[in-house]
C-alpha cells in the first residue's frame, strides 16, 4: 500500500515571449493504492487492486483563470483464475488505466500544414481512462479463446473541423464522449518441424465512438471489423551461424476514428 503526491507547474506553451509570460498551466495529482491476493485451494486464485487518484489542472491565460480538470477516479484491477485441470484453465482479467495527452497535443499553438489546413493544440484536452475486461479459456496450455470488452470514456483523437471565420480546415485533438469495443478472438500456435514456428490470431469486434457536441455537429460512428495476425519464425540454420527469419503480418477489415470510417488496413515486417 502506498500514497504519493505530485505537483507539476508548466509556464507557457506558446513560443512567443509575451505569450509565455501570460499563460500558465498547473497540474496537481495524488493517489493511493491497495492490493490483495489469495489462493483458495489448488484450483482457484485471485488478485485484486484498487487505485484512487485525484487530478486537477488550472489554466491561466492573460490573467483569466479556469479549471480544466478536477476529477476523482477509481482504477480497479483484478485477475481471477480457475484451473479445472492442467488441460483446462479459465481466467478473468479486469484492468484500468489512464492515458495523458502529449505536450504538443495540449500546446495552444497553430502549425500550418498548407494554405488551407492547420494543426491546432487543445489546452483543455483531458486525459482519458480505459477499462478493459477479458474472459479467457486456455486449452491444453496452448490454445486460447477469449471474449473482451474495452470502454474508454473521454477518449481523444485528432479530428478535423471547418474554421467558421476563414476558409481553413483545423485538425485538433478532441475528447469524445466514449469509445467502446467488444468482441471475441482465438489464438492458435503451431509448429511445422524444426523449421517453422507460428502463431495465428483471429478476432471479430464491434467498434463504437460517440461525441454529442463537436463544433455544432455530433457523431455516433460504429462498425463491425475483423482482424487477422500471423507471427512466424523460420529457422534457416541451427548450426553456426544460427540464422532465423521473423516474418509477421497484420490485416484488419476496417476501423472508425471519430467522423472517419477507415477502410482495410494491413502491415507486414521482416527481420533476421
Map each language-model feature to its residues.
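Transmembrane beta-strands of outer-membrane beta-barrel proteins
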Residues: 1, 46-50, 76, 90-92, ...
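Outer-membrane beta-barrel transmembrane domain signature of Gram-negative proteins
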Residues: 1-47, 61-64, 81, 210-235
Amino acid at each position: 500500500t502506498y500514497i504519493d503526491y505530485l505537483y507539476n507547474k508548466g509556464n507557457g506553451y506558446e513560443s512567443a515571449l509575451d505569450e509565455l509570460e501570460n499563460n500558465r498551466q498547473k497540474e496537481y495529482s495524488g493517489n493511493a493504492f491497495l492490493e490483495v491476493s489469495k489462493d483458495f485451494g489448488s484450483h482457484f486464485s485471485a488478485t485484486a487492486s484498487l487505485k484512487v487518484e485525484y487530478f486537477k489542472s488550472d489554466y491561466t491565460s492573460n490573467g483569466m483563470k479556469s479549471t480544466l480538470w478536477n476529477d476523482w477516479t477509481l482504477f480497479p484491477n483484478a485477475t481471477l483464475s480457475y484451473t479445472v485441470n492442467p488441460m483446462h484453465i479459465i481466467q478473468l482479467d479486469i484492468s484500468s488505466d489512464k492515458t495523458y495527452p502529449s505536450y504538443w497535443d495540449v500546446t495552444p499553438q497553430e502549425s500550418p500544414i498548407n494554405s488551407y489546413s492547420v494543426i491546432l493544440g487543445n489546452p483543455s484536452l483531458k486525459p482519458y481512462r480505459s477499462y478493459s475486461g477479458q474472459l479467457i479459456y486456455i486449452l491444453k496450455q496452448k490454445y486460447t479463446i477469449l471474449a473482451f470488452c474495452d470502454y474508454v470514456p473521454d477518449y481523444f483523437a485528432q479530428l478535423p473541423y471547418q474554421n467558421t471565420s476563414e476558409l481553413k480546415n483545423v485538425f485538433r485533438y478532441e475528447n469524445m464522449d466514449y469509445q467502446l469495443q467488444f468482441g471475441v478472438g482465438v489464438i492458435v500456435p503451431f509448429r511445422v518441424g524444426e523449421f517453422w514456428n507460428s502463431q495465428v490470431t483471429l478476432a471479430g469486434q464491434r467498434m463504437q465512438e460517440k461525441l454529442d457536441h463537436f463544433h455544432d455537429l455530433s457523431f455516433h460512428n460504429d462498425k463491425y471489423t475483423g482482424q487477422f495476425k500471423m507471427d512466424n519464425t523460420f529457422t534457416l540454420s541451427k548450426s553456426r551461424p544460427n540464422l532465423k527469419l521473423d516474418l509477421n503480418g497484420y490485416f484488419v477489415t476496417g476501423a472508425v476514428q471519430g467522423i472517419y470510417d477507415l477502410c482495410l488496413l494491413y502491415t507486414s515486417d521482416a527481420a533476421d
